[in-house]
Amino acid sequence: MLIVEDEILPAMALRDELEDAGYHVMDLTDRHQEALAAARGRKPDLALVNIELQGHDDGIELARELKAMGVPVLFISGQVSRARSAQTVAIGSLPKPYSALDMVKAVDYLLRHQAGDESMAPPPGLEVFDETAPGLKPDPV
């Protein structure tokens, strides 16, 4: 798991909650280039990306680059309309404010969904965008 978030305290709380749930958070950053370097070093199963990052970095552009590397992205941003406008570069969005528990449920759902497990319903608040993104299988017809 890779967390790219400009607000350090919520990002640390999110990291702790995900790790308590059994996930490994490989890196926590607030910068575009640091996130890319981390993803190149060890490809994460999922990147949680805020749209507005430090130094005027753009999370949508980061998501585009991560997708090209085969890393699925979940937007974690209060900018719902911007997230929806960029749905081709992310697999979904969980808008702020969200609880750490909501995020764990969203991650559980997305990782199971990527593995083809359709037994879990998407948690409230999670908007799934492109079900044919890398690693995601389309729903059966």
Q: Predicted segments — roles?
A:
Residues 49-67:
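Conserved phosphotransfer microenvironments
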Residues 76-77:
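Hydrophobic/aromatic residues positioned on beta-strands within the core alpha/beta folds
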Residues 96:
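A Lys-centered signature of the CheY-like receiver
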Residues 15, 28-46, 51:
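Acidic, metal-coordinating helix/loop segments flanking the phosphotransfer/catalytic sites
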Residues 113-141:
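CheY-like receiver
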Residues 5:
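Conserved acidic carboxylate
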Residues 99:
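Receiver (REC) domain switch/active-site region of two-component response regulators
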Residues 12-20:
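Charged docking surfaces used in two-component/phosphorelay signaling
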